[in-house]
């Protein structure tokens, strides 16, 4: 509840600043004073009210409506109007905040919660009853009321409207001074059940942050109002002038009381070390949230060390503006509750930096919010043209996948389908590359510029875990690698097979004498520092760690760095750590996504910079890999682009339906954007039905059935007549995994584009994923037309050399000079010419 008094002024020019602690004022309405009234309202913390005192003609009514709209929309709190005029205004201005000035016999016709102003001469019992137990605000007005009338009215819960010239903040008045002490009006509204007669008093700052709890008395309150400072009642020492000895003084901004009138709130401006005797701002502990951030930024504005990020923001207007726009864009893109909260906090930080830079306080921001809430008319609210984009034509929405019902692939008979239908069936789920790049770029830039700090923040944001360090260094603790014996044996066997296959790929040095005296060579050298990305996502994939780590070790890479997102408790899956130990990894970056890729590409304080990055991942990982590869400052290459996992199975009537379906589902469970394709060669409807039944029956038994259901919804069975037709379509599709469950395996020779081929009924794709020895890091999304899967050579680069003897120069020298002359490169020609001249060859 506010101070129980409404001072009335003849104009804003007569405002008495000593009465500002009352917190409100009322001024007369005058059309020619509208500008001054609005200007005053926008410059003060007071609740400003307006009183329309004179009658209004019909000609003046429309002008009044227009002016009241301006007043409301610029922060005027309430308008006092005669009953009839008020009712007309409310009809014209929905939401108009009015105080009905009326006589007591008219009050019953008004809404029970409508604010009213009635004469002091009304019976006090009636006035008190009009408050409806506190749900209605009742004002009383008179030019002739006496102090005893005012105090008794206030004691009944009524707010008097008093000419400000009759009010004073003094309380020891001579008999000839006919003014009302503001303190007596306040005291009349207070009650206490304490034996000592004191009033519990909460002290708060202008932002409503509690500083401490004290006591006030009938002596301290008048003195506080007179001095406009924090004066309280000490139970041992009498009046307590806050800060009189410590220097931590208080300017009294306002006094409020609670709904029962037995507790006060002093709103103050605190100076010095703070309110608390422990030299803290508050007795209730440190501030948090926006207030704490504001205090820190105002301190940094004066004291930030050179080179600090906040100092950069204060000094670099372009950087600060760019960060505000960047964070606003990220907030607009955020979808989850956690991401929205995170991005909003970032935006608040940079916005508060700008406020602090230009001397704008949170109180001023909140004042503007409060004023906006008082508007009764609204703008249309459209964004400015520069912030809107022409709406693209509505794309056909993907069909909604039912959460129940039969799980089955779409079916197409190639002999009856159009070429467009076939093309659509083989089209992968759309990857919105441009949008993904826009999301990834700020992440990559953040890590590049801010290193470990950004990496830790992004891990907290995306993985939900706060880490002290982003790196787990080798040697890795034994307790982090504890595995069941069967799992350890499986990993060891898989590592051994992958090692054997990749060691066999090591190439001998190639040496060719192209003509007498000219020997050309090619030899392999390992890439020195490699970064291996091990995905997390919907499934933990420790197998990827061995598929990347073993070839890196075989190739002889000197520095192997793993990166994998941590679990919610900050740890990694022990299988990944065990493999890292087995392949001699230097460290494991505890991060996933684009931030992990950026850390390995550019290096941070703790993450070594890598020369090449390997490994599959989601669309954000792929976008980050492609982004850093195209940044010449990163000097970092990648193994290949990657997309969602996929399989194409070619099966004939001799294939076991259960085998076929198990291969399809083993890829479908990777993710909802995975795709599986079945090319059914010369199958009857009955044979196809057996496969369809097996799809549903096996799928519903899987723990990841909901992922499978959504993947199968955009996957297809295509019926073809011949093996040749199936292989042609497979080469067109260029699958990551190609499985041939056909009677005659000789068709392998016709495979032109595939990441890896699995031949025969007993070669499930799962074997290649784990233990057969081939690598499971393969090109997806059709990139098998241009890229190989990861192999030993992927971790090497090949250097050529040539050794030319005088005899060799005799054979090729003239040809070199002639070609250099054709290209106009005389220095090239001369490098051969001077040698041949000294040899006497020309």
From Swiss-Prot:
The species this protein was found in: Komagataella pastoris
Residue numbers annotated as active site: 736-737
Cofactor: Zn(2+)
HAMAP family: HisD (MF_01024)
Biased composition (Basic and acidic residues): 390-403
Protein name: Histidine biosynthesis trifunctional protein
PROSITE patterns for this protein: HISOL_DEHYDROGENASE
Location of the region described as Disordered in the Swiss-Prot/TrEMBL record: 380-403
Membership in a protein family: In the C-terminal section; belongs to the histidinol dehydrogenase family.
Cofactor note: Binds 1 zinc ion.
Location of region: Phosphoribosyl-ATP pyrophosphohydrolase: 276-357
Keywords: Amino-acid biosynthesis, ATP-binding, Histidine biosynthesis, Hydrolase, Metal-binding, Multifunctional enzyme, NAD, Nucleotide-binding, Oxidoreductase, Zinc
Native organism taxonomy: Eukaryota, Fungi, Dikarya, Ascomycota, Saccharomycotina
Catalytic activity: 1-(5-phospho-beta-D-ribosyl)-5'-AMP + H2O = 1-(5-phospho-beta-D-ribosyl)-5-[(5-phospho-beta-D-ribosylamino)methylideneamino]imidazole-4-carboxamide; 1-(5-phospho-beta-D-ribosyl)-ATP + H2O = 1-(5-phospho-beta-D-ribosyl)-5'-AMP + diphosphate + H(+); L-histidinol + 2 NAD(+) + H2O = L-histidine + 2 NADH + 3 H(+)
Region of interest: Histidinol dehydrogenase: 358-842
GO BP term, pick one: L-histidine biosynthetic process
Region entry Phosphoribosyl-AMP cyclohydrolase, spans: 1-275
Pathway where this protein functions: Amino-acid biosynthesis; L-histidine biosynthesis; L-histidine from 5-phospho-alpha-D-ribose 1-diphosphate: step 2/9; Amino-acid biosynthesis; L-histidine biosynthesis; L-histidine from 5-phospho-alpha-D-ribose 1-diphosphate: step 3/9; Amino-acid biosynthesis; L-histidine biosynthesis; L-histidine from 5-phospho-alpha-D-ribose 1-diphosphate: step 9/9
EC identifiers of the protein: 3.5.4.19, 3.6.1.31, 1.1.1.23
Pfam families from the UniProt entry: Histidinol_dh (PF00815), PRA-CH (PF01502), PRA-PH (PF01503)
UniProt GO cellular component terms: cytosol
Residues binding Zn(2+): 667, 670, 769, 828
GO molecular function ontology, one term from the record: metal ion binding
């Amino acid at each position: 509840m506010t101070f129980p008094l409404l001072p009335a002024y003849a104009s804003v020019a007569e405002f008495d600043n000593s009465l500002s602690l009352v917190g409100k004022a009322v001024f007369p309405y005058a059309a020619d004073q509208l500008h001054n009234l609005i200007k005053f309202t926008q410059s003060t913390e007071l609740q400003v009210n307006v009183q329309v005192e004179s009658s209004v003609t019909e000609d003046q009514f429309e002008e009044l409506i227009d002016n009241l709209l301006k007043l409301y929309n610029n922060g005027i709190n309430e308008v006092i109007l005669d009953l009839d005029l008020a009712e007309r205004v409310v009809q014209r201005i929905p939401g108009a905040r009015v105080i009905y000035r009326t006589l007591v016999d008219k009050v019953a016709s008004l809404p029970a919660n409508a604010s009213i102003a009635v004469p002091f001469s009304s019976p006090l019992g009636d006035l008190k009853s009009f408050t409806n137990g506190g749900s209605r605000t009742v004002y009383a007005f008179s030019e002739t009321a006496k102090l005893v009338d005012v105090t008794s009215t206030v004691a009944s819960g009524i707010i008097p409207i008093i000419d400000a010239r009759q009010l004073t903040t003094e309380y020891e008045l001579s008999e000839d001074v006919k003014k009302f002490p503001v303190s007596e009006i306040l005291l009349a509204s207070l009650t206490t059940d304490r034996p000592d007669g004191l009033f519990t008093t909460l002290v708060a700052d202008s932002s409503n942050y509690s500083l401490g709890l004290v006591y006030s008395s009938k002596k301290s309150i008048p003195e506080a109002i007179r001095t406009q400072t924090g004066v309280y009642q000490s139970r041992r020492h009498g009046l307590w002038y806050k800060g009189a000895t410590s220097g931590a003084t208080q300017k009294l901004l306002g006094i409020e009381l609670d709904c029962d009138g037995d507790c006060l709130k002093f709103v103050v401006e605190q100076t010095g070390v703070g309110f608390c005797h422990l030299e803290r701002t508050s007795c209730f502990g440190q501030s948090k949230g926006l207030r704490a951030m504001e205090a820190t930024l105002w301190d940094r504005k004066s004291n930030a060390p050179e080179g600090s990020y906040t100092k950069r923001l204060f000094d670099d207007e372009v950087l600060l503006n760019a960060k505000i726009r960047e964070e606003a864009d990220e907030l607009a893109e955020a979808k989850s509750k956690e991401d929205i909260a995170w991005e909003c906090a970032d935006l608040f930080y940079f916005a508060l930096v700008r406020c602090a830079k230009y001397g704008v306080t949170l109180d001023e921001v909140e004042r503007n919010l409060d004023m906006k809430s008082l508007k009764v008319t609204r703008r249309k609210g459209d964004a400015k043209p520069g912030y809107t984009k022409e709406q693209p034509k509505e794309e056909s929405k993907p069909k909604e996948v039912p959460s129940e019902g039969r799980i089955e692939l779409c079916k197409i008979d190639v002999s009856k389908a159009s070429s467009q239908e076939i093309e659509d069936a083989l089209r992968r789920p759309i990857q919105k590359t441009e949008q993904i790049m826009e999301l990834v770029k700020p992440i990559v830039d953040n890590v590049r510029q801010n290193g470990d700090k950004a990496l830790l923040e992004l891990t907290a944001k995306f993985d939900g875990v706060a880490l002290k360090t982003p790196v787990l260094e080798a040697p890795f603790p034994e307790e982090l690698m504890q595995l069941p014996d069967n799992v350890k044996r499986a990993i060891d066997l898989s590592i051994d097979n992958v090692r054997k296959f990749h060691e066999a790929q090591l190439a001998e040095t190639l040496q060719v004498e192209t003509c007498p005296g000219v020997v050309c060579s090619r030899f392999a050298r390992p890439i020195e520092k490699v970064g291996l990305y091990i995905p997390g996502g919907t499934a933990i994939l420790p197998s990827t760690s061995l598929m990347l780590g073993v070839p890196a070790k075989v190739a002889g890479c000197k520095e192997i760095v793993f990166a994998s997102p941590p679990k919610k408790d900050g740890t990694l899956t022990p299988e990944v750590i065990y493999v890292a130990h087995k392949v001699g990894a230097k460290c494991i970056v505890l991060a996933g996504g684009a931030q992990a890729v950026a850390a390995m590409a550019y290096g941070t304080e703790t993450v070594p910079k890598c020369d090449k990055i390997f490994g599959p991942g989601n669309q954000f990982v792929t976008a980050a890999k492609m982004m850093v590869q195209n940044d010449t400052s990163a000097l970092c290459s990648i193994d290949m682009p990657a997309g969602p996992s996929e399989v194409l199975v070619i099966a004939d009537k001799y294939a076991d339906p259960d085998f076929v379906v198990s291969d399809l589902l083993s890829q479908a469970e990777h993710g909802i954007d995975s795709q599986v394709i079945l090319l059914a060669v010369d199958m009857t409807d009955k044979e196809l039905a057996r496969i369809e039944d097996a799809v549903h029956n096996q799928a519903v038994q899987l723990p990841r059935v909901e992922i499978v259901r959504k993947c199968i919804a955009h996957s297809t069975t295509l019926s073809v007549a011949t093996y040749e037709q199936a292989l042609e379509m497979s080469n067109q599709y260029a699958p990551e995994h190609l499985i041939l469950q056909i009677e005659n395996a000789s068709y392998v020779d016709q495979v032109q584009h595939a990441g890896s081929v699995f031949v025969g009924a007993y070669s499930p794709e799962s074997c290649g994923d784990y233990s057969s020895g081939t690598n499971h890091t393969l090109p997806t999304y059709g990139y098998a037309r241009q890229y190989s899967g990861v192999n030993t050579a992927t971790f090497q680069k090949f250097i050529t050399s040539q050794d030319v003897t005088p005899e060799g120069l005799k054979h090729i020298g003239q040809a070199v000079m002639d070609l250099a002359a054709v290209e106009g490169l005389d220095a090239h020609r001369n490098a051969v010419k001077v040698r041949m001249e000294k040899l006497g060859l020309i």
